[in-house]
Amino acid sequence: MTLHDLKEKHDKLKKLDGGGFFKGATYKTFGSETHRYKFNSCLTENILQSFEKSYGSTLPADYKSFLTQIGNGGSGPAYGLLPLLDWNVELEINDNSFLSTTFPHIDKWNATQDFDIDDDDYTETKEFQKWEEDYFSNRHITGSIRICHYGCAIYYFLVVTGNNAGQIWVDDRANDNGIYPAISKSTGGQLTFLEWYDEWLTESLNEFA
């Protein structure tokens, strides 16, 4: 999948959905009314190099190509792609070594619950409060950047450091579902950024088939 092919598929989807090609079907694809198939301006190589130098981490090549040739956020899965500089949206991260620290997970992860959820006051217990503090700790997502908000506090993120660098993962801790890799519905394998984006385009286009 080349960027040219990706752009052609995107333009087709934009025409079918965002362009109102079919009467009454405008912005039928989930989240598309938010981004309306528009991209933000592309980033320059100098900006990317400055970002990588600041955080001591190298962004995946396919993601960088997208940022410099297609757009810095905008049209994409769910409510669209976040701009690069919004990589830590809603996260309290002030550590420049965050992105250079290895992403800690190899497989899907979720924490066990060592408290009694049948207790009406379990959220007031020290056990729960300790569990909650650790569960939502940013240490579970070091070496990654948020790139897309799916809704319901679910975020897609791109791993940039470690064995899984280049892969898309999902942070679904807000719904007690932990952290897990995005899996292709067609191949069953884990997805790189462009594979993930292309799969979204394919699935969205199939809605109009």
Positions of predicted regions on the chain:
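Polar low-complexity intrinsically disordered regions
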Residues: M1, Y156, G162, I168, ...
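A surface-exposed partner-binding patch
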Residues: M1-I145, F208
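Surface-exposed loop/turn and secondary-structure junction residues enriched for glycine/proline
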Residues: D62, L84-W87, T161, D171, ...
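Extended serine/threonine-enriched, polar tracts that run as long, contiguous segments within proteins
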Residues: S137-N164
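Segments surrounding the PLD/"HKD" phosphodiesterase catalytic module and close analogs
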Residues: Y155-Q190
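Long, compositionally biased interface segments
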Residues: N177-A209
